[in-house]
């Protein structure tokens, strides 16, 4: 049993933000970090590292947990995060007390709701943001990112320097083992993807798929695969048929044992995208998905819910590079379903419209769900 969610923690939801992290955990989606644009102000506001927003897929409510102790990460954007054994690990990002990128690692215990700084042994990745991260066999993997020139021990990876910002793109690949508390560079075969940032990755059937991202002045549309069992890179996968346009700041979500869902991003021509594609990992084909809405998003986050829905939160809805206009940031949740909402959930939605005093005529399990939706009782983060 993990930390109790109190009725007092019910929230209207996170403010609009960009560059945050979001991960699935049991029946929940955890949202942390990111920043917001301030109209008419040259600087951005980074959200407090003490705040963790929790979205319940069952009650369809937001909860806010503010960390009361003095130990919590600084507000950052472009971090990456995974959940391993009831702990949220957050790595890297930008905005650390105005010092640019960081390679710090933090842990949030999901049973005690306490943050702690992790100090692993071994040589860490160079400080970056906008990298991709994933969990496999209870280890944390990090690939790529946009960061500071390497000033530490020699690394064997590509670094493409961007002189205007004194930073650059990298294809560094590192593994963090929580049991050993060590960083290491896994031995791999095959051809690594080129240096990139603002790409996306998804794990499926023992393989991780990496799509797109920015490399120098190019926003790419290549797909790469790493077999996590034998640590072999595929090189760029040959694709049959149409391919999504090149992009960065998009999301890629494993939907089943076969398909990945790509959503949104930022095009080569600085257009905020709202298209959705499904990638078949068996046949290596892309198929566009027609959605009943058009909601442009970039630098958003996407998670798979317990109901096999892709939940997309946050991100910019307008050109993030337009200096004459403050970018607009989304506060709603975009839901992508590959099949209709279940009859049970639809009935619950309809039943809520009826007076509460007739709920007593319903079975107890349905009453419990309705009470969760209305917030009448305290709640636990229950295992799925």
Regions found by a protein language model. Name each.
Residues 3-4, 36, 301, 306-384:
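Cullin-RING E3 adaptor/co-adaptor recruitment helices
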Residues 5, 63-65, 116-118, 184-186, ...:
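A structural motif specific to WD40 beta-propellers
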Residues 11, 25-45, 67, 84-100, ...:
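Glycine-centered tight turns/hairpins at beta-strand boundaries that repeat
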Residues 1-13, 64-66:
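A short helix->beta-strand "capping" segment at the edge of beta-propeller domains
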Residues 72-73, 97-99, 124-125, 192-193, ...:
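Short glycine/serine/proline-enriched coil/turn segments at secondary-structure junctions
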Residues 47-61, 102-114, 155-181, 221-232, ...:
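Beta-propeller blade signature
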